[in-house]
């Protein structure tokens, strides 16, 4: 290569280098200036790939009635922003109304805003530097606090309320129910009614043969169940120990059961033949119904013996002349035409005890004294 050619190359390179250096700064300076000098463009046109400046383009937009998914999102965003603005304005108006009502009621004037320290932040209040202005107490007991961010005054204050201290709830006593306090006891059992056994007799009248040496002027009654029904006719008492009762020593009085036969209406046929202290016997003179009457009488005696709740006899019972008793001596003579007295075995002396009465149809009632 000639020296002249090398000198020309140097000159060309020297001439081109300043131009290149001048071009590079121009390209680097356009990049940061674009965001600063960029004017707002239409969002609808931008969604469709068209760049149009927003100034004077609101009525001339070609995609103003477009309903694609991108344009629908733009509409929803505008509606949300409009609702936020309306809510903020409503809160500001409500806060001003509450403040005016508090001042009219004579509340204390608002104090100067105080700076909240970082260590004195209460729970429930967001952290940060906000100006807290105490407000008058509301009727419900909550103390409203107005938080105003220091850098954003245009959004308006936010109204917060602190819950009041825990107060005891009003207690209403429950009215007493049907069951009172304490241990409940069931009501006492009532006395069962007396066992009633009715025996029908169809035979003519037969006189009664009592024990010898008994007084007919003594009557036996039931004090708890009231007096027995007064019926015309003769009444008789038979005293005989039941099977299974303790007899005891011979020198002590025997505890026996007394069978009282009370007749109602016309006198019926009845023949009582007392036996020894160890047994008792009822002799009936009726023919066809003798076995039936004996069976019913035996069932009545067993039921009376098993009865555990029977009334007690009182010794101070007034005598009744209508009763023909066999408990005392000096019995009356037999009526004319009758069979008379038939004493068999030694007399029995009853002791006070319980008694249960049985009504026997035309014959009357049977009472067992134990």
Curated annotation (Swiss-Prot):
GO cellular component terms?
Answer: nucleus; XY body
Tissues expressed in: Expressed in testis. Highly expressed in ovary.
What disulfide bonds does the UniProt entry report for this chain? none
Query: Which regions of the protein are recorded as binding DNA?
Result: 42-89
Query: Could you give a GO molecular-function term held by this entry?
Result: sequence-specific double-stranded DNA binding
Instruction: Name the InterPro entries on file.
Output: DM_DNA-bd, DM_DNA-bd_sf, DMRT, DMRT-C1/C2_C
Alphabetized SMART domains for the sequence: DM
Q: Would you kindly state one Gene Ontology biological process term found in this protein's UniProt entry?
A: regulation of DNA-templated transcription
The UniProt similarity line reads: Belongs to the DMRT family.
This chain belongs to the protein called Doublesex- and mab-3-related transcription factor C2
Q: Which organism is it from?
A: Mus musculus
């Amino acid at each position: 290569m000639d020296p002249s050619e090398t000198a020309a190359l140097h000159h060309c390179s020297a001439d081109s280098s300043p131009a290149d250096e001048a071009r590079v700064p121009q390209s680097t300076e356009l990049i940061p200036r674009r965001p600063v000098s960029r004017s707002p463009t239409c969002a609808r046109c931008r969604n469709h790939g068209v760049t149009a400046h927003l100034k004077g383009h609101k009525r001339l937009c070609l995609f103003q009635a477009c309903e694609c998914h991108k344009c629908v999102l733009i509409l929803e965003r505008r509606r949300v922003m409009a609702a936020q603005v309306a809510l903020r304005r409503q809160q500001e108006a409500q806060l001003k109304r509450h403040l005016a009502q508090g001042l009219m009621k004579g509340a204390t004037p608002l104090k100067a805003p105080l700076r909240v320290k970082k260590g004195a932040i209460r729970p429930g209040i967001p952290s940060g530097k906000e100006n807290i202005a105490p407000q008058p107490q509301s009727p419900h007991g909550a103390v409203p606090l107005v938080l105003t961010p220091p850098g954003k005054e245009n959004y308006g204050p936010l109204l917060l309320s602190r819950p009041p201290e825990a107060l005891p709830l009003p207690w209403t006593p429950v009215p007493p129910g049907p069951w009172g306090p304490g241990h409940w006891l069931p009501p006492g059992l009532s006395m069962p009614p007396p066992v009633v056994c009715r025996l029908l007799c169809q035979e003519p009248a037969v006189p009664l043969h009592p024990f010898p040496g008994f007084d007919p002027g003594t009557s036996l009654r039931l004090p708890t169940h009231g007096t027995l029904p007064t019926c015309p006719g003769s009444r008789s008492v038979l005293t005989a120990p039941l099977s299974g009762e303790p007899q005891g020593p011979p020198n002590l009085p025997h505890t026996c059961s007394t069978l009282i036969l009370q007749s109602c209406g016309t006198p019926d046929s009845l023949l009582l033949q007392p036996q020894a202290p160890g047994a008792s016997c009822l002799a009936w003179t009726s023919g066809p119904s003798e076995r039936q009457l004996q069976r019913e009488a035996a069932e009545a005696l067993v039921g009376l013996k098993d009865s555990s709740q029977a009334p007690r006899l009182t010794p101070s019972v007034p005598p009744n002349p209508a009763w023909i008793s066999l408990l005392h001596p000096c019995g009356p003579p037999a009526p004319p035409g009758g069979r008379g007295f038939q004493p068999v075995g030694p007399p029995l002396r009853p002791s006070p005890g319980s008694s249960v009465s049985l009504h026997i149809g035309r014959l009357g009632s049977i009472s067992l004294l134990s």
